[in-house]
Amino acid sequence: VIDAVAVEIDAEAVVVRAARPLVVVSSAVAGGGLGRARALVNLRVPRDVDCATVGARLAEFARRRDLPTPWVGLCTAAATERAEVVTERADDVTATAIATVGLSNPVSAGLSARAAWRPATINTLVLVDAAPAPAALVNLVATVTEAKVLALLDAGVRLPDGALPSGTSTDAIVVAATGRGPACPYGGPVTAVGWAVARAVRAAVGTGARRWLEARR
């Protein structure tokens, strides 16, 4: 997908391993925030998992699979073996989106009532072969979110009451950059890096959403 970055997908997890540390911004449950990571994990867990055990589950998985440290970890009840992987390029920038999509708890931000955490979710890992500035990394999180919402609308996802979706109640995003290649001061949707990221995310999430809906018709 991207040189010196390996992606492993199976029924247990989506794993990204990097030969050199990636610069990462994420909302991950383990290792989230802004930092560096040699591995990214999106671990499948039971739908009724006790959220207090998620950190320990991720740590046990990391040990068993011998993941390099530091690592960033997410969890999902969606089928990880059905992760959608899309790569897009713009100018000298390459972006890969890896999305797992579960839509059993869709929400409309600002309308849906507060609720307990659930692992059925949309998790989006984005790999960028470029050198975005810290502010651009944050900007890319917004770009990923915009593309995700549009993908759901395009796929025809709606809440039971007909409201438009913004995602699910527990969506998570990871944006990880190699730090090599072109410098990117901005990450909006019409920059080279933002354009590549948005197209990859929109395609990956859209395909995953349509597949989820079709399986339940």
Regions found by a protein language model. Name each.
Residues 1-217:
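Alpha/propeptide regions of enzymes that mature by internal proteolysis
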